[in-house]
From Swiss-Prot:
Catalyzes the attachment of glycine to tRNA(Gly). This is Glycine--tRNA ligase. It catalyses: tRNA(Gly) + glycine + ATP = glycyl-tRNA(Gly) + AMP + diphosphate. The gene is glyQS. It comes from Alkaliphilus oremlandii (strain OhILAs). It comes from the Bacteria. Its EC number is 6.1.1.14. InterPro entries: aa-tRNA-synt_IIb, aa-tRNA-synth_II, aa-tRNA-synth_II/BPL/LPL, Anticodon-bd, Anticodon-bd_dom_sf, Gly-tRNA_synthase/POLG2, Gly_tRNA_ligase_bac, GlyRS-like_core. Keywords: Aminoacyl-tRNA synthetase, ATP-binding, Cytoplasm, Ligase, Nucleotide-binding, Protein biosynthesis.
């Protein structure tokens, strides 16, 4: 019988096993900052590798990019971030606590089992709703709020030795704009033709007012974004193609389909640049949370940058000579969020019998921090086991573990998601075979050492 999966259990495992630590912990921490430990950095890197493999490496359409975090501020004027990238804030007049108005409303709706979309509401609509429903301050219970005002989410800093408006720059709030400003550079040097895509993985920063839920919403985060450029009129076809592609990527990495829902935005929810948007939402223990967004951004971004920079982003079809500004389809996913979803989804407490329950992370082998662990049956077999470890570690991330009983070592690796434990015993000296123990089934089989690499290559495929 399965036990309840809670965020407390996930966070406890992540901290105790070296997946994720609180940031700056020895100085009391810094709110909503997290450091990825030895296992966490492997999980996160494996998520990024899996995305890059399917979206870039194996796609005949797409190429990669790594654009700078710091950009000319005119970039953010053109994209609309300086003027319109903000959250609606209000303060409780009694206790001076600060809240996002839309989040207050969403939390209230959740408590009432209502399904209403707040995106796109004006400040006045939100204020009226809060007053009519008599929504109270979550901190003190008062019903006396300030008017709603907009708060820009970009982190501002200065470049150079002086601090004035002429040296003001921003940490990027998204990776997409670095792709748009490099559109012509990539098109020219990669010799691609429309349709084609540019993908990148990188850090972004947003001064969120209500970050939380572990690594789900943080001020510093990593994105995996693809900007796919196509001919106007073919955009909805490509929009549906990338929606299906994203869904298959998640399911092929063993995310449970019943924990995933796909929600198309209503017209009133759409961003000013979007013709169509779909959110992939995952059912976390704290509720449904947005995992991935796929948007039809039309030609908005290229036209904005053309207008503000004077650069012509018109594309000429080499066969028909037709000229147009390409439309753009954007699948955008947060690395931290999707890694958390995989971690939550994989967590299982399996009841073996009345006295025995094992914790196991049923991660897809491609995502597992360690692909295998080499375990000598006794320390007397250490030299031979280490030799095997060194051979395997040339191709895979492998652990070597000789501490404790073999049963305890198995359970330890179940808990961190290692799909295969390889035991080197005394028989191995004679028959040159090892015992492979499978994480999910706990079944064991004997395999020739000479066949191990071929065996693991097949099992670790993605």
């Amino acid at each position: 019988m399965a036990t309840e999966k809670t965020m407390e259990k996930i966070v406890s495992l992540a901290k105790s096993r070296g997946f994720i630590f609180p940031g700056s912990e020895i100085y009391g921490g810094l709110a909503n900052t997290w450091d990825y430990g030895p296992l966490g950095v492997e999980l996160k890197n494996n998520v990024k590798k899996a995305w890059w493999k399917k979206f870039i490496q194996q796609s005949p359409y797409n190429v990669g990019l790594d654009a700078a975090i710091l950009m000319n501020p005119k970039t953010w004027e053109a994209s609309g971030h300086i003027g319109g990238f903000s959250d609606p804030l209000m303060d409780c007049k009694k206790c001076r606590s600060r809240f996002r108005a839309d989040k207050l409303i969403e939390d209230y709706m959740h408590s009432q089992n209502e399904e209403t979309v707040v995106d796109g509401w004006s400040n006045q609509q939100m204020k009226t709703y809060i007053e009519e429903k008599e929504i109270v301050c979550p901190e003190c219970g008062a019903k006396d709020f300030t008017d709603i005002r907009q708060f820009n989410l970009m982190f501002k800093t200065f470049q150079g030795v002086t601090e004035d408006s002429s040296t003001e720059i921003f940490l990027r709030p998204e990776t997409a704009q670095g792709i748009f400003v490099n559109f012509k550079n990539v098109l020219r040097t990669s010799r691609k033709k429309v349709p084609f895509g540019i993908g990148q993985i990188g850090k972004s920063f947003r001064n969120e007012i209500t970050p939380g839920n572990f690594t789900f919403r943080t001020r510093e985060f990593e994105q995996m974004e693809l900007e796919f450029f196509c001919k106007p009129g073919e955009d909805l076809e490509w929009f549906n193609y990338w929606k299906e592609f994203c869904k298959n990527w998640l399911l092929n990495l063993n995310l449970t389909e019943e924990n995933l829902r796909i929600r198309d935005h209503a017209e009133e929810e759409l961003s000013h640049y979007s013709k169509a948007t779909t959110d992939f939402e995952y059912r976390f223990p704290f509720g449904w949370g947005e995992l991935w967004g796929v948007a039809d951004r039309t030609d908005f971004d290229l036209k904005q940058h053309s207008e503000h920079s004077g650069e012509d982003f018109t594309y000429q079809d080499p066969i028909t000579n037709e000229k147009y500004v390409p439309y753009c389809i954007e699948p955008s996913v947060g690395v931290d969020r999707v890694a958390l979803a995989f971690l939550v989804d994989a967590y299982d407490e399996e009841v073996i019998d009345e006295k025995d329950t094992r914790v196991v992370l049923r991660l897809h082998p491609a995502l597992a921090p360690f692909k295998a662990a080499v375990l000598p049956l006794t320390k007397k077999l250490k030299d031979q086991a280490l030799e095997l470890y060194e051979t395997l570690s040339e191709n895979y991330m492998v652990d070597y573990d000789e501490a404790g009983s073999i049963g305890k070592r198995y359970r330890r690796h179940d808990e961190i998601g290692t799909p295969f434990c390889i035991t080197f015993d005394y028989d191995s000296l004679e028959d040159q075979c090892v015992t492979i123990r499978h994480r999910d089934s706990m079944e064991q089989e004997r395999i020739q050492i000479s066949e191990l690499t071929t065996y693991l290559n097949e099992k670790l495929k993605f």
